[in-house]
Amino acid sequence: MKYKKKIAIIMLMVNIVVTLYLLLLSYYNRLSNDDWTFWNALSEKGIWGFIGETYLTWQGRFSGFFLTSLDLLVYQCLGNLILPTLVLILAGTYANYLLLKFYFPNINKKLLIVISNFLFYISILGLLDFTTFYWVCASGYIKFVVLSEFLFYFVIKKSSNIVDYILIILLSLLIGGSAETFTPIILLLIFVRVCYCYFKSYAIFIECKKELLALCVVFIGFLFMVFAPGNAVRLSSFEHDFSFSGLLLCLTKAFAQYFIYQLPKIFYATLALFPGIFVGQTLGESSTLGFMKNISVKKVISISSLILFIVIILAVLPGSIAVYALLPLRSLSFLSFVLVAHFFFIGIFLGINNYKLTYYVPLCFIVFFLILGYRFYKEIPNCQPYVNSLSKREFKLQILNEQILYRGVSDTLVYIQPLPDFKYKDLNCIYLDYMESLIYPNREKKINFKYFPFLYDELSSDKNNFRNISYKKRLNLKFDIAIVSK
């Protein structure tokens, strides 16, 4: 009992500290880069006009653009992004809670809330690209994971009403148009669930009606996304090699790259072992689950790891086909949640078989709090100067704009100074620097990996860059702008 109580207290402490950390950062978060392009389109055309234009000319992820529009409207009303961040935290915690409560109904509800919040937080901290959580255009990758959890809950819950079916349709449609890397994984999971229900009910399809409904709607949304005219426009800018050897080589490289980026972040996912052990020990005390003690833990780890490997391959495969490379790390954000689920599942079986990992608990969480404390120390003090720099730049440009309007000058190019560099070297950056030196020892110009929790709202030295044009349009400037080249 002391062991379980210790884990519960530590998880609660983690939740409090991480909540403070995430909300403090959200207070300083601002729109950046593509956000302003979308902001301008949304202001001119409205939500549906914006989605229609991007669908026809850029990309088919209609539901992703819909969620982005909602966040931009909130920012337009409130002037900050605290509310979307808070809603995402609450939704992610509640989605975890619903699923855990369904599978583990005998565990105390308050403890399930603590565990649910903890699992969501370590999934966020373990993101391959943490800026995904705060970048409006990219945060949809996380939101769709949460929406998928809600979808699975409404599909698997025993009793259903008309509201549940409506929610299944809406959630399925949103997930169908989420991302080419993510939707196929959801389709596969729903299909597995359909097969399970089919054989469990002795081939009576009526027992699988919710699963079949979700499968059909997600698939329709997926087709609508994949065959969008805008996809052809975007893909035309990439080179492709559809030969088997070319795809295999690209897939191998993409998987190796993913592994390199994932390795330093896997620590956060391993923390899911401890709430898993907590749940497993509680289940082990139930006589009805005594048979699970006879299942080999090594066998469970092997099977779960094999499934994890297959999911990772399926995740990097679309990028290998579409752009012949590993997609941006933000598009693989859902793998952070998959890794947490993997270790949580293993932890349950460790707990059932009375593995406590007693000595690892304090060590792991001491390391965790040291890492988080360092992030607090390096990031929070720099957030205010970062925001001040953005405001100062904008204020100067607006003053200059008024002067140019007064003088009647046109076709002017104004050079502005780049933002101060508030990025810093964390352990992940040091690791990536080392890996680059091993893989590319003769590269003359090496990548200088540096980190900041937000995507920098930096412009280009080219006045025709889309970011410069969007920034100019947002401020209604009467002159072109460009960054002074370093």
Where are these regions (language model features)?
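Membrane-interface helix-boundary motifs at transmembrane edges
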Residues: 2-3, 100-111, 158-163, 198-209, ...
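Intrinsically disordered, polar/acidic, low-complexity terminal segments
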Residues: 4-58, 68, 72-112, 207, ...
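Alpha-helical transmembrane segments
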Residues: 6-21, 113-120, 169-170, 213-220, ...
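Transmembrane catalytic cores of multi-pass membrane glycosyltransferases
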Residues: 23-86, 135, 173, 180-331
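Membrane-interface micro-motifs in multi-pass membrane enzymes
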Residues: 34, 111-156, 179, 313-348
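Transmembrane alpha-helical segments
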Residues: 91-103, 147-159, 174, 187-195, ...
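Short hydrophobic alpha-helices at membrane interfaces in multi-pass membrane enzymes
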Residues: 154-174, 212-213
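Signature aromatic-anchored transmembrane alpha helix within multi-pass, membrane-resident enzymes
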Residues: 164-166, 215, 294-305, 350-376
